[in-house]
Amino acid sequence: MISRGSKVRILRKESYWFNQVGTIATIDQSGIRYPAVVRFENVNYSGTNTNNFALEELIEVSEVETKSKEA
């Protein structure tokens, strides 16, 4: 399941970051059209490194690593 910190591949063909991997910064739960904010290493033509995507436009590459507490 896609969650904060997950690595995702972009499927939106008209995106600057098409087929590149980014990290989920946040996921909005309010029901908006593009709830996932994805952060990238490189910037686009206007100098930004984040963009909003629909969950259907993303494929999870690797899950976020959870830290387990050892007793």
UniProtKB/Swiss-Prot annotation:
Q: Which family does it belong to?
A: Belongs to the PsaE family.
Question: How the protein sits in the membrane?
Answer: Peripheral membrane protein
Q: Which Pfam families does this entry report, sorted A to Z?
A: PSI_PsaE
- The UniProt gene name for this protein comes to psaE
Keyword annotations of the record: Chloroplast, Membrane, Photosynthesis, Photosystem I, Plastid, Thylakoid
GO BP annotations, alphabetical order = photosynthesis
Task: Give yes or no: UniProt keyword Electron transport.
Answer: no
| Described purpose of this protein according to its UniProt entry | Stabilizes the interaction between PsaC and the PSI core, assists the docking of the ferredoxin to PSI and interacts with ferredoxin-NADP oxidoreductase.
User: What InterPro entries would the database entry show?
Assistant: Elect_transpt_acc-like_dom_sf (IPR008990), PSI_PsaE (IPR003375)
Protein name per UniProt: Photosystem I reaction center subunit IV
Q: What's a single GO CC term here?
A: chloroplast thylakoid membrane
Superkingdom per UniProt: Eukaryota
Its localization reads: Plastid, Chloroplast thylakoid membrane
